Amino acid sequence: MSYVSGYVPVIPLKNSVLFPDISMPLRIGREKSIAALQKALRDNHWVILLTQKNPNASVDKIEDLYQVGTLAKVESFRMEEDGSYNIFVKAHQRVRLIHSRDSEGHIEAQTEALEDSGRLDKKTEEALLSSLRQLSDDLLDLLPGNTRQIREMIAEIEDLQTLVNMCAAYADINISDKQEILEIPLLKDRALKLLDRLQELKERLKIQRGIRDKLQESFQQNQKESILREQMRVIREELGDHEGEDLFAKFKDKIDKAGMPPEALELAKNQLRRLETSNSASPEYQMIRTHLELMTSLPWNQSSAQQDIDLEAAERVLNEDHYGLEKIKKRILQHLAVMKLRKSQQGSILMFIGPPGVGKTSLGKSIARALGKKYVRVALGGVRDDAEIRGHRRTYIGALPGRIIAGIKKAGENDPVFILDEIDKLTRGFGGDPASAMLEVLDPEQNNTFQDHYLDTPFDLSKVFFIATANSLEGIPLPLLDRMEVIDLSGYTVDEKRQIARSHLWPKQLKEHGLEENQLQITDQALTKLLTHYTREAGVRDLQRKIASICKHMSLKIIKSEGLPLLVEEQDLEDIFGAERFSADMIGSLLPPGVVTGLAWTPVGGDILFIESAQMPGKGNLLLTGQLGEVMQESAKIALTLLKSRLPLLDPLLDFAKKDIHVHVPAGAIPKDGPSAGITMLTSMASMLLNKPVDPKVAMTGEISLRGSVMPVGGIKEKVIAAHRAGVQEILLCKRNEKDLREIPEDIRKDLRFHFVEDVNEVLKITLGVNVPKWDQVQLPPPSPLSSTDAGT
């Protein structure tokens, strides 16, 4: 090989020394090294490999490197996604640094070749060859594993320089010793120095083997763990590495104090043994370490300090944090009373169902405060992979525990109040069904052995007080719903919202905006107008935002007035929010025939809806618009069938065969479904056909059957509150829904007039003032005599 002259790119080596005739894979990741490699690849693939004096320091100048290295050629390379390179180099020549310079973000150097000075006589060379072979065989005897191929390779080498380079490159000796051997000019001296270092290595291996043999003889099978630890201690002392020993001791102490059950304890000890024997640079080492950190940080036996339930304190906390909701608070206190009597909270799984902003999540916080327990919340909206619940298996890169175990770790106690927020928003995806994964979490018979895939050992969730929240029962699988006690939270009345605003929202927003109570106040008239003309919701979330906007708007005025107290009055609301968004009375003074006010339930509370009907010449067809679902379409068909069978008894001139009827429910962009609009659709079509308007202050809800019966529906409280809010004065309900009025506040009930009906004839009489005769009251003509042909004779 001819020597390469001129400037050649320099690549620093951290923990290795490359000898001539030796090939080695290298990973190039530092910026200067990448620049040097790219320069070499553009030219002739030659590089100079120099070892760093301090492997832990960055290379800023040539003085940070040893002055003797090797000239090597890049045989192959591959660029990785992160911009680094994996290369394969072969060293050709020892070289000494003459001159260096910085060039294009890397170091280039001129070198001189280091040739062996002086020749060895044949006897000396053979003696050194024999000594190296014998010492190499002795070292291989002390190493574990199959070394046959290495022995055969050494036996085939006849050149002393090649054998010296090979043994120096692969022997487990210090980097500084390898560098010293590389720099020695004479081959004989290099061989003698190498023999000296290999002899030291042999003695060290013999000591280690002696320690291992002695320990194996002294200890029994049940003390293998101590043997391995002692071996690693000796090895680390020889290498000067104490970090691994400290980490091992730390984990051992944590495992002893964690209070794990037997199965988890056995897994942790196995993982600790694997950690001890793993290379700290390997991915497996980091995976085991992360797993052990999770296992030792979980609260296996750490519970909250307060175990006894103080019902009086719990009631006081609930009343402090929430106004109204008396029935809900009573249900919660009953649940806590059962827990107190059982002296256990196993099986404590509640579900709060209600519109946004009614206090579902904040009730969970209050329960945690009342019980003196940690509070953990996990948002489940949009979760579509069961690994989010059960965790990922550790075989995957970037694996993590599931949200349940992660929440328990965050709490630091094994009995927190755990909020599963928006559980109705779980969706099935390609990664599995998270709702099915929740079955094991929420089943009191199974969750004492809940197994997270990442944790890989059972964890007891039976002490956790789970509280799920949802806006609707729709979308929640029945098996999952069956495992929870459902508590409905309906919307607030205007009076309740007024009290909540005064007692909770207004003081809270004043504090958050740096205001004192004596600096800013709001009149009762302004607060009422804010509730009726600028917000319309079941909860109080939008109300809280509006109060925050008032505080922001008035803060500037307070500063300009030099801190003088201000009062928010009715006229100020228009300056802050603009024109009124809602009318206190949504119902008009008059509706045309065919338009009727109905009541609906939505996941965000009750609401009113108008159903419109029109007729035109046709062939008896029914046209339905407004994005109506199948059940609602069937209700319209039943209503039309009832009218076809009954209205001709009232008006014989009605000819349905020559009319097309069109029924529309406004807000056509919103899908609608359910049977509760049955009587509303029937009344709307009857009003249109008889050309009689219905009082807009009259609203109704109820399902109808083909016999004309009015059947009960759900969501009565939410619907009645919405009707009252909209200005309705009379409501038609099924007779069997009369019992549901007990849930409605007294101040709302006394403002409304209720009609309880059992048949559609009663509905038509109340709304249209018509008295449709029943079939048994109709005088039918006598049947005509049958002809002989009709009689079949």
Curated annotation (Swiss-Prot):
GO terms for biological process: cellular response to heat; protein quality control for misfolded or incompletely synthesized proteins. Keywords: ATP-binding, Cytoplasm, Hydrolase, Nucleotide-binding, Protease, Serine protease, Stress response. SMART domains: AAA, LON. Residues 590-770 form the Lon proteolytic domain. It is an enzyme of class 3 (hydrolase). Homohexamer. Organized in a ring with a central cavity. This is Lon protease 1.
